[in-house]
Amino acid sequence: MAAWDLLFRRVHLATFAGDEPYGALRDGALAVRTGRIEWLGAERDLPREARAAQEIDGAGGWLLPGLIDCHTHLVHAGNRAREFELRMQGANYEEIARAGGGIRVTVIATRAADEAALVVASRPRLARLIAEGVTTVEIKSGYGLELSAERRMLRAARALGDTAPVRVTTTFLGAHALPPEYDGRADDYIAEVCDVMLPALYREGLVDAVDAFCERIAFSPAQTEAVFRAARALGLPVRLHAEQLSDSGGAALAARYGALCADHLEHLSEAGAAALAAAGSVAVLLPGAFYFLRETHLPPAARLRALGVPVAIATDCNPGTSPLSSLLLALNMACVLFRLSPAAALAGVTRNAARALGRGDDLGTLEAGKLADLGLWNVDTPAELCYHLGYNPLALRVFGGQISGAGDVAQG
């Protein structure tokens, strides 16, 4: 037989394929050729003639799919530390937003930054995720709120993916907030999003999916639906920030349009959960924002799972409500705050996160034919990835069949 490029021996495999927790296969081996998994199974079943250009002794560690952060606002300029101080003095998210703070503060800073500055500002956040075994990251626009600034954000996201060992998927979030120049004219702004911004950015190849923020401080269900119609006319998948602060019916709307996912969902109704289940949409839970905003209304994680809704977990990395660039910490938060099991939480940053990005066919599980994005972890059980605080047990990271890490992120 021809030599494999890479062969892992003496590893336990957490495949996340099938119905068993972790999809565990102990005392396993896994082989890679031309960037994809070619063989995996019990090490005793390796072909006798098996050989590889490079062999890795896993020393009894656990091999998992590369982690996926499926909801981030990673590209932005500035920070909102002052807003954090106000919140600690008693102001809430809605009060800050209605007083002209919140997202608009980041819009001002991001509009003032050129593409190169956005790349430089965002690269350390991406490097921290990569260092924790993340191999795929979703990055949204939404802090430009006009064509040229939204373009710069999406181009910066593409540039990050081109210069780092990570897959970046881009999401156009023009309907994130109402820019100040459109005060009192939300319908006019949505028309600009749908008729000008989205078509232009789509033609430039900058958009993989379209998102919106359906909430009383953002956009109505009718305005959100206009964005969805425009996306669907271009053949683009949709996703939605829904039911974070109130039950607006956004999840049911997302389900009606076959959305990849609906995200946040703290105030999700039974009808909304059932709609997501019927549509096959993923529920993306964001414990960082829940924690940072000191929310008390839990998303119905157990009910979602009982209904068969795939549950994903993400950092929601953003400057205002979740300045978090640690997916490992998000895993712990999901278990402690949302009462997910470690197996369910880890499925949420592998198999279900891939589904939330429409990449379930080639990412998120260890199966023959899938892309060889892998993490070798120096742990006795996969649950340790959710258990530890401030500790990263990653031993080795593989991206597209090549061993790589945060040190490979270009600094120029």
UniProtKB/Swiss-Prot annotation:
It catalyses: 4-imidazolone-5-propanoate + H2O = N-formimidoyl-L-glutamate. 4-imidazolone-5-propanoate binds at residues 80, 143, 176, 244, 321. InterPro entries: Amidohydro-rel, HutI, Metal-dep_hydrolase_composite, Metal_Hydrolase. It is an enzyme of class 3 (hydrolase). One of its GO terms (biological process) is L-histidine catabolic process to glutamate and formate. It comes from the Bacteria. Keywords: Cytoplasm, Histidine metabolism, Hydrolase, Iron, Metal-binding, Zinc. Fe(3+) binds at residues 71, 73, 241, 316. Catalyzes the hydrolytic cleavage of the carbon-nitrogen bond in imidazolone-5-propanoate to yield N-formimidoyl-L-glutamate. It is the third step in the universal histidine degradation pathway. Belongs to the metallo-dependent hydrolases superfamily. HutI family. HAMAP family: HutI. This is Imidazolonepropionase. It comes from Aromatoleum aromaticum (strain DSM 19018 / LMG 30748 / EbN1).
